[in-house]
Amino acid sequence: MDENESNQSLMTSSQYPKEAVRKRQNSARNSGGSDSSRFSRKSFKLDYRLEEDVTKSKKGKDGRFVNPWPTWKNHSIPHVLRWLIMEKDHSSVPSSKEELDKELPVLKPYFITNPEEAGVRETGLRVTWLGHATVMVEMDELIFLTDPIFSSRASPSQYMGPKRFRRSPCTISELPPIDAVLISHNHYDHLDYNSVIALNERFGNELRWFVPLGLLDWMQKCGCENVIELDWWEENCVPGHDKVTFVFTPSQHWCKRTLMDDNKVLWGSWSVLGPWNRFFFAGDTGYCPAFEEIGKRFGPFDLAAIPIGAYEPRRFMKYQHVDPEEAVRIHIDVQTKKSMAIHWGTFALANEHYLEPPVKLNEALERYGLNAEDFFVLKHGESRYLNTDDENF
């Protein structure tokens, strides 16, 4: 499939004082503490698109999707060229495999050594970071992937374009049985053609794909038949697991794969709402008011996967990619108890030093009165089990 992609870009909002952060955290904990409240939270058969105070997807006069918030700004071709030509690249990714193995080790995921342990069947939740925005989530008797990319390059061609400097921790053939895949948008580092083909070849119609509005035709051309295409605030489920609701929720970004298809496909985040756990996947996003809306409707979440990388230079990137401080604000806005860092340490997509995002994240957490366990960073291939049923969680 011959495809091409360019980059665009984005205003920081007001800061939260530490007291406000603690107040919102306490509110989130109090609203989801007891067993009875955890099970009573499953009441999602409302159509949130009918609510007056939710931000609905919007199209311009040309019929293409647009970001509906003042926090978005389109960049012209001269702005893109200035970034590509004039801005200094500080990423400094070493060519030495030994140095990379020391700084960013790639672990063998637990499910390769002990495949029989895959699948959390109790009330807990387990996540495994497979690099970039690819996360394997096990919760509420389901296993699903977010934005799977197992290829060496995030590009229409495996001979050019952004190349991984950290390999994927596993192959698709080594994955446990996957029930669903969540796609946030159609950029090459989030929607990888080769990974889609390989996942479909392995799992076929047993695998349900949840994709944004406008992507159904592309998925069907790849041979995928079990595809659910959703607008913001629409929901669906995996057959046989109707107690777990997948809601496509807003984010601030853009879409493009070819020269002429700008924003013909919607972009967004995902809220996964189960009887025991709630998971939020931010996808790729700039900071915007949508996250408070999501937290208001579906919070508190037990875990969120939030991007922390590809943010420099800010005057170009801020509209489409949050920096670590804005990632912490999303953590607060969606009312999540824990967050994990994604979208860093895999591809050099922007100009910050390749090891800077976790450092900036810890600095931001300290400013907001949070600790590293509230918003944690995993190694490639590393898993984290969260006992979400523990009253102290």
Swiss-Prot record:
State the family named in the UniProt similarity comment for this chain: Belongs to the NAPE-PLD family.
How does its activity get regulated?
Answer: Activated by divalent cations. Activated by bile acids.
Reactions that this protein is recorded to catalyse: an N-acyl-1,2-diacyl-sn-glycero-3-phosphoethanolamine + H2O = an N-acylethanolamine + a 1,2-diacyl-sn-glycero-3-phosphate + H(+); N-butanoyl-1-hexadecanoyl-2-(9Z,12Z-octadecadienoyl)-sn-glycero-3-phosphoethanolamine + H2O = N-butanoyl ethanolamine + 1-hexadecanoyl-2-(9Z,12Z-octadecadienoyl)-sn-glycero-3-phosphate + H(+); N-hexanoyl-1-hexadecanoyl-2-(9Z,12Z-octadecadienoyl)-sn-glycero-3-phosphoethanolamine + H2O = N-hexanoyl ethanolamine + 1-hexadecanoyl-2-(9Z,12Z-octadecadienoyl)-sn-glycero-3-phosphate + H(+); N-octanoyl-1-hexadecanoyl-2-(9Z,12Z-octadecadienoyl)-sn-glycero-3-phosphoethanolamine + H2O = N-octanoyl ethanolamine + 1-hexadecanoyl-2-(9Z,12Z-octadecadienoyl)-sn-glycero-3-phosphate + H(+)
Q: Which UniProt keywords apply?
A: Acetylation, Endosome, Golgi apparatus, Hydrolase, Lipid degradation, Lipid metabolism, Membrane, Metal-binding, Nucleus, Phospholipid degradation, Phospholipid metabolism, Zinc
| Binding residues annotated for deoxycholate, in chain numbering | K256, M260, A348
Protein source organism = Pongo abelii (Sumatran orangutan)
- What function is annotated for this protein? D-type phospholipase that hydrolyzes N-acyl-phosphatidylethanolamines (NAPEs) to produce bioactive N-acylethanolamines/fatty acid ethanolamides (NAEs/FAEs) and phosphatidic acid. Cleaves the terminal phosphodiester bond of diacyl- and alkenylacyl-NAPEs, primarily playing a role in the generation of long-chain saturated and monounsaturated NAEs in the brain. May control NAPE homeostasis in dopaminergic neuron membranes and regulate neuron survival, partly through RAC1 activation.
State where Zn(2+) 1 binds.
Answer: H185, H187, H253, D284
> What residue stretch is flagged as signal peptide?
none
Any matching Pfam family: Lactamase_B_2
Descriptive protein name: N-acyl-phosphatidylethanolamine-hydrolyzing phospholipase D
Q: Which domain of life is it from?
A: Eukaryota
